């Protein structure tokens, strides 16, 4: 009975979220020409649960990072099935790294300047939170996501059935491939006629920042800071575009789930996926993290700002307040001509109540959570 009284407020929130997304996507389109123009320069920026058995590189040593990079660039690399580990967290060692870049590809995102950052050791989920993980949380708590409360979420048009599209009469003006779909949520990623059947090991979608925090709290974890996330993404390598080096496809091999073809009209799926990939797809980076770029955007704990000090910082946590939260890593929808944000230094933002069909998360922790 309380729902009708809540409905006007929800409609207002939905309108605000849609306006914000429109602005963000407009910025993405505006920045695409610059990103494309800088492609050559980017290529020349540098050379190219608990107690589980540890994967090679899980401790994040420099040797592991260099081995990962060498393997990525070595001939004849093949990718076979990799079983999920018994625990979902790997240790990330304390260290110092260069955060951001002095060669920003999308200036308005605040990628610059490069600055020296020190982080303490912590733990990071090896995988993005999966549908199976999130379902355990929902079954345990009865939690309703914000997309479920609002009654809709944004879905990429290319993933929708014709039946669903016939009921949609609006789109984001600056990016008409984004459609607000009634009934779209984590259980129904492409709308009411879709399901997560056979996708239990894919990343959970349509989770807002608030939803992600709720899950992390339940799991005895937290969201990573932007600095922790970027440090983890780099996997022990310094000043590289991607977790494995500077070449997107070393020796023709795919290391991330991003868009292939002409966005948004044709995705060839050359990497094996046209939508999300399983959370254990593709080789892990030097710290043992899978899909740290591509697949789905990942929330961080930081409030958004584009102003950064060049002074050295220790365990930075971002601004103390704001209206948007930082997300990192890009998604399966990212293409260099449109959204060149699958680089470690790249970043974007969204309101804490926003959700979409390419947005997920992974957790961090200061210590390994104890089992109940």
UniProtKB/Swiss-Prot annotation:
GO terms for cellular component: endoplasmic reticulum; endoplasmic reticulum lumen. The keyword ATP-binding does not apply. It is found in: Endoplasmic reticulum lumen. It comes from Mus musculus (Mouse). Monomer, homodimer and heterodimer with SUMF2. GO terms for biological process: post-translational protein modification; protein oxidation. This is Formylglycine-generating enzyme. It is an enzyme of class 1 (oxidoreductase). Belongs to the sulfatase-modifying factor family. The lineage of its organism: Eukaryota, Metazoa, Chordata, Craniata, Vertebrata.
């Amino acid at each position: 009975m309380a729902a009708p009284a809540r409905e006007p407020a929800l409609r207002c929130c939905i309108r605000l979220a849609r306006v914000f997304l429109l602005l963000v996507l407009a910025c993405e389109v505006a920045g695409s020409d610059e990103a494309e123009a800088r492609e050559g320069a980017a290529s020349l920026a540098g050379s190219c649960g608990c107690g589980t058995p540890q994967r090679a590189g899980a401790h994040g040593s420099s040797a592991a990072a260099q081995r990962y990079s060498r393997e990525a660039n070595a001939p004849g690399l093949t990718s076979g099935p990799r079983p999920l580990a018994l625990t979902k967290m790997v240790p990330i060692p304390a260290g110092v790294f260069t955060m951001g870049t002095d060669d920003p590809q999308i200036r308005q995102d605040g990628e610059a300047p490069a600055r020296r950052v020190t982080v303490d050791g912590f733990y990071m989920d090896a995988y993005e939170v999966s549908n199976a993980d999130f379902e355990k949380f929902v079954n345990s708590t009865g939690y309703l996501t914000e997309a479920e409360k609002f009654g809709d979420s944004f879905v990429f048009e290319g993933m929708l059935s014709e039946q669903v599209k016939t009921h949609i009469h609006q789109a984001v003006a600056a990016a008409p491939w984004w459609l607000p779909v009634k009934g779209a949520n984590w259980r129904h990623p492409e709308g009411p006629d879709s399901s997560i059947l056979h996708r239990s090991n894919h990343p959970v979608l349509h989770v807002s920042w608030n939803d992600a925090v709720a899950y992390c709290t339940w799991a005895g974890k937290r969201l990573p800071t932007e600095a922790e996330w970027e440090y983890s993404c780099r996997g022990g390598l310094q000043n590289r575009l991607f977790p494995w080096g500077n070449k997107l496809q070393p020796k023709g091999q795919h290391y991330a789930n991003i868009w292939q073809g002409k966005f948004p009209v044709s995705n060839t799926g050359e990497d094996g996926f046209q939508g999300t990939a399983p959370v254990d797809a593709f080789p892990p980076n030097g710290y043992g993290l899978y899909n740290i770029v591509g697949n789905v955007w990942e929330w961080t704990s930081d409030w958004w700002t584009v102003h950064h000090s060049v002074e050295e910082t220790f365990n930075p946590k971002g601004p103390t307040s704001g209206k948007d939260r930082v997300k990192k890593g890009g998604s399966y929808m990212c293409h260099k001509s449109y959204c060149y944000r699958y680089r470690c230094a790249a970043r974007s933002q969204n309101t804490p109540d926003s959700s979409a069909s390419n947005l997920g998360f992974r957790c961090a922790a200061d210590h390994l959570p104890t089992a109940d």
